[in-house]
């Protein structure tokens, strides 16, 4: 595979024309079979694998030869469940063939994406979801509209094959891909007659389809935005003394009219910022309401024409930042005005200037989180803590660790918000619910539990790791921590409670559009 990568770098055209012979290389299926045994691409537990299962590469070659014929593609999924690509009871042959197919298709994609990423200086790859918020903190105050767009994930299999056809010139190598996609499309459990491509599937094949699909969407969308934008050279140019920004712009426009009309467009052109996490993307726009409507229309039209997809209107929602809050990534996102008083002394005179700046302000959704805690039986509807009866059969350490994990995840995820006072109400509910759960387990009261286990039990054990995470505990430092944001680089996904609330918000938006 390494030699093939080097060979592809030297001659990309030859690399695209000779992918199909790789399906018959034994080394390829040795790699894919090792990946399958390691559990890197399958959700099947290792204890379900039979040690006496003899794997034959000749059998795999015969399966590859038969999969080219549409009528015999079912041979690939012998001894599999009706949904062969999603069920955990898969045969080693089908899994290895899918793994080998993925490895072959990843070769041209990895080379192309590497060259494309090298040409984009602003491209950054981060695993933590908190890496998005510093970008929003920098771009949101200069924007007045925000669009929350969800990428459509229901795709016809032929659309995926045609997308790969633009990249891979070797037509025979696409026959196995077409057979696999249509086999899954025609499975009895797939009622939508389309391929569901989502980034939450553990199968490496589906993860590759999702990454390639999103890459195609964004690469073409970015090229269209760059062509339509007149401020390509001005995008990264800093303006000094941003306090009197509008006054400087007006002065430059008057001066530019004497030279050329193009300079005026460079300064008047709106700014569009794009960021994506998973299947959700955020577009921050600085412009008029008409421009936002046009961007939304063109985005829906682009998906419909290029991918032949009907994208529902509720998948692209626009909000004005100064009036409404947008719910995304588990936060209420808004921009608030922050007044500043600046005193300047020149000789004997003292000048006081009032400056108003926009500030990115993510808000913690306390009320929705309390509703989710009530649904999970940590408290009632009014917010009174109750015992978690389903956990009374666990040990004391397991109960304490579970409550500790819930609070630690919530506190870490919302550490970037200024107003974290509402989180202490959640901490009180969780701590009292933990005490009631222990009391219910030992058939005693909270007072007896604290007397036996110690009055400082909850503060020492349950929340021992979340005491502001090594921040100084002085009063000044505690007050300063309320004014500072802490973005963590070790949060790979949205909190489960927060994700449930985000799904509820999405359903509300869908119901509004249905009405």
Swiss-Prot record:
GO terms for molecular function: RNA binding. Signal peptide: none annotated. Belongs to the intron maturase 2 family. MatK subfamily. InterPro entries: Domain_X, Maturase_MatK, Maturase_MatK_N. GO terms for biological process: mRNA processing; RNA splicing; tRNA processing. Usually encoded in the trnK tRNA gene intron. Probably assists in splicing its own and other chloroplast group II introns. It comes from Pinus cembra (Swiss stone pine). PANTHER family: MATURASE K. This is Maturase K. GO terms for cellular component: chloroplast. The gene is matK. It comes from the Eukaryota. Keywords: Chloroplast, mRNA processing, Plastid, RNA-binding, tRNA processing. It is found in: Plastid, Chloroplast.
